[in-house]
Each structure stands twice: as C-alpha cells, then as structure tokens.
Amino acid sequence: MTAKGQMLQDPFLNALRKEHVPVSIYLVNGIKLQGQVESFDQYVVLLRNTSVTQMVYKHAISTIVPARSVNLQHENKPQAAPASTLVQVETVQQPAE
C-alpha cells in the first residue's frame, strides 16, 4: 500500500469507526454487507452488525458507502488551503549557450 493510499483510507475508516457510522460495503463480486466499522488494519476491515463481526479483506471491497457524511478534519493537522486559493508559478528560462 502506498503512503498516499493510507493517507486517504485511514482517516476515512477511523472517522467511520469513531463516529459509529452505519456503512454499506459493496464487494467486488456484488455482495452488499452492512454494519459499523469496528476496526481495521492494512489488509482487513472488521464490520460489526447486530449478530456477528465479519472480517472483510480490503482487496475484496469495491465501495464503502456511509449512511451519512463524516468529518475528516483533524485538530492536529493543518487544514488544506481553500479551493479558491491561486498559486502563481514563475518559470525562468536559461539563455542558450
């Protein structure tokens, strides 16, 4: 798993876990699982419903759909710049020799 993948997955799954958000998990074979994220690591997600906890391998997951929106802002991390922020990049060409 790339660092970028973990930077996206971990905060999302952790917010779902902490906020006890009900989720629907669609597997690559089309099966729909429902429950709450109990725990997760690099390879699996533990999904709890009323009767059982299931271990779902991440490579089998197609989509995770939360029942409501989740807040991914963290107090410890600086907030991203607003979308309207413009960055000017200046290029300087070296004279030909």
Curated annotation (Swiss-Prot):
Cross-referenced PANTHER family: RNA-BINDING PROTEIN HFQ
Similarity field: Belongs to the Hfq family.
GO cellular component: cytosol
PROSITE patterns xref list: SM (PS52002)
Organism: Neisseria gonorrhoeae (strain ATCC 700825 / FA 1090)
Record-annotated Sm domain positions: 10-70
Protein name (database record): RNA-binding protein Hfq
GO molecular function: RNA binding
Subunit (UniProt): Homohexamer.
Domain of life of the native organism: Bacteria
Biological process annotations from GO: regulation of DNA-templated transcription; regulation of RNA stability; regulation of translation, ncRNA-mediated
